[in-house]
C-alpha cells in the first residue's frame, strides 16, 4: 500500500465527508480514509507543494463537501500523488474535470511517470485521455 497511489469513483464516494481538503490530501500519506494521525509540519508542506502543482492550493482549508465535483476529483488526485508512489492506479481520473484541467492533469501524470521507477495503470472509457507516457494499452 505504501508504494501505491490510487483514485477511483468508489474512493470519491467514500470521501463524501466534511473534512478540509488538506486533511484529505494528508490522509494519502497514511493510506487511510480520513486523517487519524496529525501530520507533521513537513508533511503539510509536502501536501501544499502537491496542491500547488495541481493549482488547488487555495482549496486547502475548504471542506470537501463545499467543493465542486471537479475540485473534489483534483483533491483525490493530489492525495494519490502526495507520497510519491511507485505505482499509480487511476480509475477514470478525469471524471468531472473540464477540458483545461484534463490537459493539465494529463501533463502532470506524464511528468510524474517519466521519472525512474514509476508505473501507471489507468482505466478510461476515452482513449484520447491516455497520457503520452502510456506504452501498453488494452481496448475492451
What feature does the model see in each segment?
Residues 17-34:
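Q-loop/switch helix immediately C-terminal to the Walker
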Residues 26, 41-59:
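Conserved ABC ATPase "signature" region
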Residues 63-67, 71:
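Conserved ABC ATPase signature
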Residues 77:
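Hydrophobic anchor residue at the start of the ABC signature
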Residues 84:
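Conserved catalytic motifs of ABC-family nucleotide-binding domains
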Residues 88-92:
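Catalytic Walker B motif of ABC-type/P-loop ATPase nucleotide-binding domains
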Residues 99-101:
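Helix N-cap at the start of a conserved alpha-helix in ABC-type nucleotide-binding domains
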Amino acid at each position: 500500500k505504501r508504494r501505491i497511489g490510487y483514485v477511483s469513483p468508489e474512493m470519491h464516494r467514500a470521501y463524501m465527508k466534511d473534512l478540509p481538503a488538506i486533511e484529505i490530501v494528508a490522509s494519502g500519506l497514511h493510506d487511510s480514509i480520513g486523517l487519524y494521525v496529525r501530520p507533521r509540519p513537513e508533511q503539510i508542506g509536502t501536501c501544499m507543494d502537491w496542491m500547488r502543482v495541481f493549482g488547488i492550493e487555495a482549496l486547502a482549508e475548504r471542506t470537501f463537501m463545499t467543493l465542486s465535483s471537479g475540485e473534489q476529483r483534483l483533491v483525490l488526485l493530489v492525495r494519490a500523488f502526495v507520497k510519491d508512489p511507485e505505482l499509480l492506479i487511476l480509475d477514470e481520473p478525469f471524471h468531472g474535470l473540464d477540458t483545461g484541467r484534463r490537459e493539465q492533469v494529463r501533463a502532470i501524470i506524464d511528468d510524474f511517470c517519466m521519472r525512474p521507477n514509476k508505473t501507471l495503470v489507468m482505466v478510461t472509457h476515452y482513449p484520447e485521455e491516455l497520457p503520452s507516457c502510456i506504452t501498453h494499452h488494452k481496448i475492451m
